[in-house]
Amino acid sequence: EWTRSILKYYRLLGSPKITSILITHGHTDHIGGLDRIQEEVQAPVRCHPKLANKLGKLLSCPELVIPLRSDEFITTGGRIKLQALFTPGHEIDHICYYLESDSVMFTGDTVLGASSTSVRDLTDYLNSLNLLKNYKHEIVCPAHGPVVLAPQGADLVNWQIQHRLKRENQIIEALNKGLRQVPEITDHIYPTTLKQGLRPSAERNVMTHLEKLIKDGKIKKITSKFELQS
């Protein structure tokens, strides 16, 4: 349905020339229908190098996929420049796009408009958030949720960093209280009002934090239990 909507509005605009199709990452809700869109707009697909092979298999002509370089500038037909920022964490192949001239950050799934995102590697994710923080932006355009305007947009990335660090401290507190299993740690740090459908995501987020704490040398895993290092 989204593919049809995109193509509908593209035609309503008079089918303007598209210079590049920019991909944030390779999750299905971000690349579904790419073959149909590319066939209509006849533009090359730009993405993270680790995603290029996968996207090449989706298209009739793999040569249409051109990997981006970290920090590469993409210039549109209107001479507007976007900068590709490699931001792993939510996914290993994630890219955000920075429009410096308008102080806009297109964050994909790295920063959402009304909630926190799922994270594959928390260390990478926090590094990516700290990278984004270095780029002056007033507006955040996420892939999910509302656009966040100034002044909130400028603070959103830092809020996400503080949110993750708060969760980490809550998990350490739970371990200090003797909680050892992911489900019971999740019960401790998430509100009882958590919707049932969000429970699996909450447990995955707890597990991601625990994996980071292991890498940091702060905890160790014994079978399926976790405890603080002595």
Model-derived segments and spans:
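Active-site HxH/HxHxD metal-binding segment of metal-dependent hydrolases
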Residues: 1-79
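Aromatic/hydrophobic pocket-lining residues that form the small-molecule binding cavity
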Residues: 31, 125, 206
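Short, solvent-exposed loop/turn segments at secondary-structure boundaries
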Residues: 57-60, 116-120, 197-200
